[in-house]
Amino acid sequence: MDRGDCRSVLGLVCRVRLEDFANGVVLPHEETLSKAKEDRFQLLSATRCNFSSIYSLYRDEGGLTRQRLLNLKNTCPPRYAFSDGLVTHRLWVVNDPVAIQALREDFAGRKLYIADGHHRYETGLRYRDALREQGAYLPGSEYILMTLTD
């Protein structure tokens, strides 16, 4: 691979509270197809598991969140690192309550723009609403797996 083609993406993989689009917190940009959502709903209902994160963008004016993530990344080696020869992934685990709270505060009031995963996000909303209608509560059903990047 030509080193000139290298790219680096810094993201935060986390759970995000499901928000109805009308609330203006999580914003879509494309239409979705019913058949694809039905497939995903059946899978989520059967497994109660997010297999793939929603990829979302946020604005980090001033770069505070990015700097926080870089600082966390530089405090220890990655927990997981793997490569297929072309793409390398490195994952760090953040379990420091102070760091987690700082990141939560960074994202409070910030809009998230779905770049990839509209069908999965809408499926998460439907699943959450179905459980609410049944009076059922499952830990995590109010959240969805998301990767956030600026």
Question: Where are the predicted features?
Answer:
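Surface-exposed, charge/polar-rich loops and edge strands
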Residues: M1-D150
